[in-house]
Amino acid sequence: MSRKRSKMSTSGPLSNCYVDAIMGQDSEDVYGARYIQAPHMVTPRPSSVGDNADFASCNFAPKSAVFSSSWSSVHPQGIYHPYVHHHHHHHQSHLPSADGRYVGVRSWMEPISNHVSFAGLHTSGRSYGTKPEVLPLKDAECDALEAESRPLSAGFVCAAAACPDRARKEHGASELPSHDEHKEEKQQQLDPNNPAANWIHARSTRKKRCPYTKYQTLELEKEFLYNMYLTRDRRYEVARILSLTERQVKIWFQNRRMKMKKQNRERSGKEHI
């Protein structure tokens, strides 16, 4: 027994611990017979079974059957090969070495590969232990791809469409102050000592209260200088010539007389001072 342990310990500390835990106190002949029979128990893969077999037909045996079953019923490639799983390459990378020693020891806590053949286990090209882990990963990747390829919501599209309008509004608002500054400069250029020039070139910013044009105002001023009060016939003629109503002509003359009286009071006040 000690000679057998020293021989098995040359494959490494992991295989030595594994052999001590599994072998127990059985005789060397039993294990020799089992290890000799193992390479001849290679069962070819059924050609009728595809990679996309139905998972509903799989009936897993309890774990107690793994330890109590004979070593001859378990394919050595499924137990001793390193845990490197390839979906399309099974029969070349997991063969034991020529001197009878096995390259790696697989932990019993890991999922059993599809090479292990039990009575109630249906052989398939895929590993049932890794299948439940692959599906959630694929779902997560699909969700990530869908989130990246998902188009923008309607709120972002509307906000992007409103950007040009907002830019135009800001541009128009920036032009308004420059226009007002231009008006102020023109008003400053007017001569304060020449009221006639100020009246002709004046541009009030507030809404105009009368529809009179410059030509109409000039003709009314001429008529006022000639006669401060108009008769009904003369008022009718002036309204017809200037395309105004008699009421408009009457109101203009009333306002003009009030303005003249105000100017006269200011002049008289300056003379008394």
Swiss-Prot record:
It comes from Takifugu rubripes (Japanese pufferfish). Keywords: Developmental protein, DNA-binding, Homeobox, Nucleus, Transcription, Transcription regulation. Residues 205-264 bind DNA. It comes from the Eukaryota. The keyword Lyase does not apply. It is found in: Nucleus. SUPFAM superfamilies: Homeodomain-like. Belongs to the Abd-B homeobox family. The keyword DNA-binding applies. Residues 169-188 have a biased composition (Basic and acidic residues). GO terms for biological process: anterior/posterior pattern specification; DNA-templated transcription; embryonic skeletal system morphogenesis; proximal/distal pattern formation. This is Homeobox protein Hox-D9a. One of its GO terms (molecular function) is DNA-binding transcription factor activity, RNA polymerase II-specific. Signal peptide: none annotated. GO terms for cellular component: nucleus. Residues 169-197 are annotated as: Disordered. Sequence-specific transcription factor which is part of a developmental regulatory system that provides cells with specific positional identities on the anterior-posterior axis. InterPro entries: Abd-B_homeobox_TF, HD, HD_metazoa, Homeobox_CS, Homeodomain-like_sf, Hox9_activation_N, HXA9/HXB9/HXC9. The lineage of its organism: Eukaryota, Metazoa, Chordata, Craniata, Vertebrata.
